[in-house]
């Protein structure tokens, strides 16, 4: 995290985000080594249904995906521990030569690589430390490639970011490549809010860890005691709005940005959004950026979807 955090790009993104209304921190601050560990703990929480629903789909559909793709290279964007990816690795084993897990956390990626190299000795595990929004064009060639973005990570992108990302994916795909994406669907608000405000407070610790990372890397003075956790449904944008809210008026300094921020009581600090999708709207959005949905699978409850996509002919 330290090398990434001191980079000009993240400093500029942080400066820009803190100048918006509401103030925002780039999501990448969540994923230092501690944050990555906390996120993996979140994926095991009973309230956080997303990985279980996605697992149900991949367990059932991975053989079909493998039959259609015959992929030689599997790329996973934001790989984490690649838990659900194992269904794809198993199904693609007859043709797969290389797995490229991409993640911003070098330490976490190293651990994942060691485990997968032992589990899949016939597949070259070729880790890539980076940000999938910026580094898509730097990924290894050698198709057919299946590029996967699982866990509804696509929902963490703001609409303009998401459009740019989908456009970049369409541009990166060769004729025999495909894009596989996990998508959380709109559902009961109480279930959504519970998923991001669990009883054990793990998600709150995950979000607060972003402040700790900013304090460490940017010599900032965020005081955890002056903020309360806030995760709520935004009906207008159809996303979960996740972050913190100032309990009292105070000033925060970010020495490495040469910045001071005045928070009024109740001012929000957004750390993440998690958009929820409807099929028709998602297909229109992707189609406008050059991607066609070839298959759309949901879990039995209709909570979650996995879409297999290809680039539309120019």
Regions found by a protein language model. Name each.
Residues 89-134:
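Class I SAM-dependent methyltransferase SAM/SAH-binding core
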Residues 1-29, 36:
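N-terminal auxiliary segments of SAM/dcSAM-dependent transferases
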Residues 191-275, 279, 283-289:
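Substrate-binding/catalytic lobe of Class I Rossmann-like enzymes that use SAM or dcSAM, i.e.
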Residues 22-71:
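Class I SAM-dependent methyltransferase Rossmann-like catalytic core
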Residues 171-186:
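Conserved beta-strand signature within the Rossmann-like core of class I S-adenosyl-L-methionine
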Residues 156-168:
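A short, conserved alpha-helix within the catalytic core of class I
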Residues 82-86:
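Glycine-rich SAM-binding Motif I of class I
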Residues 71-80:
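Conserved class I S-adenosyl-L-methionine
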